[in-house]
C-alpha cells in the first residue's frame, strides 16, 4: 500500500463521517481490527464492536474536519483533525495501521 492509498483512506474515512455512513467505515476495517479511542480506554475488538462505537459517535452528531496534512510511515498514516459535536470541539490525531490487504488493522486516537 503506497502513501497515496493511505491518504485516500483518510479522505474516505472523513467523507464517510460526513455522510454518517457506518457501512463505508465498516468496509475499511479488517475483520479482527482494534480501535482504541482515545488511547488508554477500553479497546473495541472486531467489526461488530467497532461499528457499534462508530454508530454512537455518529448518533451524537460528530463531524470530522481535517486540520493538517496526513503523514505516512511504514504501514501507517497519522492525521490531525477536529471532531465537532454540538457544544464541543476536540483536537485529535488518529493513527491507522494497515494489514497486507489494505484494511485498517488498528486505529488509535490521541486526544
Task: Locate predicted features.
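Generic alpha-helical hydrophobic packing signal
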Residues: 9-16, 43, 78-81
Amino acid at each position: 500500500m503506497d502513501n497515496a492509498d493511505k491518504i485516500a483512506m483518510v479522505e474516505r474515512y472523513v467523507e464517510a463521517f460526513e455522510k454518517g455512513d457506518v457501512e463505508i467505515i465498516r468496509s475499511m476495517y479488517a475483520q479482527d481490527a482494534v480501535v482504541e479511542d482515545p488511547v488508554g480506554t477500553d479497546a473495541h475488538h472486531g467489526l461488530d464492536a467497532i461499528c457499534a462505537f462508530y454508530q454512537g459517535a455518529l448518533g451524537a452528531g460528530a463531524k470530522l474536519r481535517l486540520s493538517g496534512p496526513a503523514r505516512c510511515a511504514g504501514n501507517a498514516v497519522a492525521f490531525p483533525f477536529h471532531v465537532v459535536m454540538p457544544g464541543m470541539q476536540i483536537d485529535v490525531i488518529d493513527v491507522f495501521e494497515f494489514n497486507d490487504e489494505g484494511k485498517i488493522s488498528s486505529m488509535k486516537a490521541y486526544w
